[in-house]
């Protein structure tokens, strides 16, 4: 069984000007969504003594930047969650991988009316190829963390 957690919301402005409802939404989707979906599948994976949880996180989970305080906090939270969960469930044959792409060529920023130069973004197909590689890895091999980005980013 494989779970791929791949949902996220972006928020970019100074903390004191952020709307509290928007902050809660970002935390709910980016961090609590990962935790709750993982929690839901672990009993099945434990029973099967096998499983793979892949969390599509972000390089924001190891970096920091002004005006991305909330977004980065959620992504750092996912990074810590992945590492701790991997330690917790390895004894049941469950693997956990933290995938941290750099800026990806998606329409997320356009939908939010944020101007971003996507020329140095990574194509989503490359991230998909990486995920397929992780899934195809033998069940006794874990890839705990991997970053992927455009060479010019």
Language model: regions and residue ranges:
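Conserved NAD(P)H cofactor-binding loop of Rossmann-fold oxidoreductase domains
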Residues: 7-11
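Substrate-binding pocket helix/loop in short-chain dehydrogenase/reductase
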Residues: 14-15, 19-27
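Active-site helix of classical SDR
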Residues: 38, 74
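Residue(s) in the substrate-gating loop at a strand-loop-helix junction
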Residues: 58
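C-terminal helical subdomain
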Residues: 94, 98, 116-153
């Amino acid at each position: 069984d494989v779970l791929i957690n791949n949902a996220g919301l972006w928020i970019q402005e100074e903390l004191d000007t952020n709307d509290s409802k928007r902050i809660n939404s970002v935390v709910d989707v980016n961090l609590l969504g990962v935790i709750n979906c993982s929690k839901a599948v672990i009993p099945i994976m434990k029973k099967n003594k096998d499983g793979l949880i892949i969390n599509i996180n972000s390089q924001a989970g190891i970096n920091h930047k002004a005006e991305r305080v909330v977004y980065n906090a959620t992504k750092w939270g996912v990074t810590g969650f992945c590492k701790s969960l991997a330690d917790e469930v390895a004894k049941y044959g469950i693997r956990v991988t933290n995938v941290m792409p750099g800026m990806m060529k998606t329409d997320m920023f356009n939908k939010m009316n944020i101007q971003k130069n996507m020329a140095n973004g990574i194509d989503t197909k490359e991230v998909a190829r990486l995920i397929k590689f992780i899934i195809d890895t033998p069940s006794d091999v874990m890839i705990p963390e991997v970053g992927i980005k455009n060479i010019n980013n």
